[in-house]
Amino acid sequence: SRSQLLLVTDELWSHPRSVYTDIPETSNYLDHLGLLAKSLPSTIQQSLELRRHLGQRVVGHPVESWWLNQLPTIDMGDSSIPFSKIVKNAKLVIVAHNGTTIPENFSRGIPTLITWTSNWVEIRDEAKPIFAKLAEVGIFHEDPVSLAKHISAIWDNVDAWWESKEVVEARELFCSQYAKSVPRPRKFLRQIIVGKLTMGQQGDL
């Protein structure tokens, strides 16, 4: 049975590249996630598994010792297991970065929460109403303590919350912009490549 609370983290850069939205090691990223973890009830903390970004050792310092100091019981995860398999076995996924995991999980119906602050992720103006809706139904949280409270509230029946009318509507709103499925994807891609459609029509965070 699915029992894990999976926390998917981003890489932290010792020397962030100015032309990208790299998160620097000097940011409050780890403090934010540490507060989230420590604000969870102990029973849920024991279910917490970390999925660290595979590029962390290349672009910055290892984070294992930091996490184990914060929460000695945390499961540091096994990077040799494919991410798709780990996600499938999770009861609930927390995504702490703006990446493909969010639209992929939404389109596959995997219960997923999002947390970040404007310090690390800047939401484009056209996406703000969508994220406001995600926040309204409890999917998106900028405050780690409110996220921990929400997880505690839904933990005993995650699926009931995830399949509730308002949450389904918010997910569909997001997917209509950022995870749209098309009946003939190869033809659709070919049309984009030859310029008959623009990627802007598909939405972009």
Outline where the language-model segments fall:
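C-terminal alpha-helical cap of glycosyltransferases
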Residues: Q177-L205
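Hydrophobic, Leu/Ile/Phe/Ala-enriched alpha-helical segments that form helix-helix packing faces
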Residues: H32-I44, W67-L71, N105, I151-W155, ...
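Long, low-complexity, Lys/Arg-enriched
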Residues: T9, L71-D75, H150
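Catalytic binding pocket for nucleotide-activated donors in carbohydrate/polymer assembly enzymes
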Residues: L68, L92, H97-Y178
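Conserved catalytic-core segment of nucleotide-activated headgroup transferases in glycan assembly
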Residues: S1-W66
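Donor nucleotide-activated moiety binding/catalytic core segment of transferases
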Residues: S47-P103, S107-R108, S118
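Conserved phosphate-coordination/catalytic loops
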Residues: I23-D31, G77, A179, P183
